Design a protein with these regions (language model features):
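Conserved segment of the thioredoxin-like fold in thiol-based oxidoreductases
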Residues: 29, 77-117, 122, 128
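N-proximal helix/coil linker or "cap" segments that precede and/or mark the start of modular domains
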Residues: 8-32
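Thiol/disulfide oxidoreductase modules built on the thioredoxin-like
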Residues: 100-107, 115-158
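Hydrophobic beta-strand core positions in alpha/beta domains
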Residues: 54-56, 88, 132-133
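Conserved redox-active cysteine motifs that mediate thiol-disulfide chemistry
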Residues: 57-74
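A short beta-strand-turn-helix
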Residues: 31-53
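Short pre-active-site segment immediately N-terminal to redox-active cysteine/selenocysteine motifs
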Residues: 51-53, 57-61, 127
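Sec-dependent signal peptide recognition
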Residues: 1-9
């Protein structure tokens, strides 16, 4: 089953070659996303928001994604009142895979779904998890692929710097 998901994600990524990658310093793309809530609201990711955005692309089958959720919960507790907004964008093909994942790894931050992969294409996502830190003016300031607990100190420093600007 993991092999099939890998093949699906590889095929998904193959569509990104024609799209130029979002780079540090560029404006963040605007996206329409589906809320993971009983109301099924449409969420618009747009800028500027006067908040620092931590945008994380993830999938339920991704082991590093699961490891990143406690860190994002920690960030949300520590920095939400200072203006950090965490938006975790799910890329699963089957939306039914999301709820069991969230039961195992609860989230205190916004979870949305990119059902047509349009936001992932706009950001030129190459791997999951992929994290984009976006400043209050809507510029991408930091991009990180993967998740390793040993690298969280650097990310904390960057978030604090962006919140202080």
């Amino acid at each position: 089953m993991i092999y099939i998901r890998f093949i699906f994600f590889a095929l998904l990524l193959s569509e990104y070659t024609a799209v130029s990658a979002v780079s540090v310093g560029e404006n963040s793309p605007d996206c329409l996303l589906d809320s993971i809530s009983p109301h099924k609201d449409i969420v618009k990711l747009e800028h500027p928001t006067n908040k620092v955005l931590y945008v994380d692309f993830w999938a339920s089958w991704c082991s590093p994604c699961a490891k990143s959720f406690p860190f994002m919960n920690h960030l949300n507790r520590q920095f939400e009142e200072r203006g950090l907004q965490i938006i975790a964008i799910n890329l699963d093909e089957n939306p039914d895979d999301i709820i069991p994942f969230l039961r195992r790894f609860p989230a205190s931050f916004s979870i949305v779904r990119d059902k047509n992969q349009q936001c992932a294409k706009a950001f030129s996502v190459q791997a999951v998890p992929s994290t984009y830190l976006i400043d209050k003016q809507g510029r991408v300031r930091y991009i990180h692929l993967g998740f390793r607990p040993s690298e969280t100190t650097q990310m904390l420093k960057i978030i604090q710097q962006l919140l202080d600007e």
